[in-house]
Curated annotation (Swiss-Prot):
Family classification: Belongs to the eukaryotic RecA-like protein family. RadB subfamily.
CDD domains: archRadB
Gene3D superfamilies membership: P-loop containing nucleotide triphosphate hydrolases (3.40.50.300)
InterPro entries: AAA+_ATPase, DNA_recomb/repair_Rad51_C, DNA_repair_and_recomb_RadB, P-loop_NTPase, RecA_ATP-bd
Task of the protein: Involved in DNA repair and in homologous recombination. May regulate the cleavage reactions of the branch-structured DNA. Has a very weak ATPase activity that is not stimulated by DNA. Binds DNA but does not promote DNA strands exchange.
Recorded GO MF terms: ATP binding; ATP hydrolysis activity; ATP-dependent DNA damage sensor activity; damaged DNA binding
Protein name per UniProt: DNA repair and recombination protein RadB
BP GO terms, sorted: DNA recombination; DNA repair
A Pfam family: Rad51
Entries under PANTHER family matching the protein: DNA REPAIR AND RECOMBINATION PROTEIN RADB, RECA/RAD51/RADA DNA STRAND-PAIRING FAMILY MEMBER
Keyword annotations: ATP-binding, DNA damage, DNA recombination, DNA-binding, Nucleotide-binding
Amino acid sequence: MKTDRVSTGSTAFDDLLGGGLERRAITQIYGEPASGKSTLCLMAAVATLRAGNSVVYIDTEGFSVERFTQIAGENAGTLADRLYLFEPLDFAQQGTMIADAEGLLKNGHAPVGLLVMDSATALYRTELDLGREAIRKLSHHMIKLLGLAKKYDIPVLITNQIYMDVERDRVAGLGGTALEHLSKAIIRLEKKDSARRAMLRKHRSRPEGLSFDFTITEDGIRTV
């Protein structure tokens, strides 16, 4: 019997999210470069693969086979057989590959247990000169992802880049209010000297502001 949540591969992140990644919903992780976003995506993917399911992984920033192998360990080769990797080169391809992913959700060799997009907004940056049209396209991509999550009863995990919101005088995730609204849970990752901090920014049943500190290790993360 399915549980309503899927493990991130980290007890600390699972606890922060009230038990793991929620099915039929988008969970967003945002933060500066090298804050641990991709590591968490790979950990969640490996945890799902180890549970016997497949993973659809859309990577716009260059998938690291070495990092996947470090986290997956000695069974990396076997697990990789059920990792469906898409690597779009531009924003239009990103939309096409999101649509293509549904074929795997319908007909994969093993049931797909997780869809990851790392990052949802890297290619969006190249479209910013289009103004509102860029936002419209990004919203369409996210609505399609949310539709897949609901239709196939899986969690979707996305990462997001950051910018300085001058009007609010704070660091925020790209994509505006549309991306924030479509994400049911949002975690911000911050660098703190040699460590990192994960802070809950949005959740339907957990208080905003919950946090813990961690370091990035060869095989994933370690809480401190």
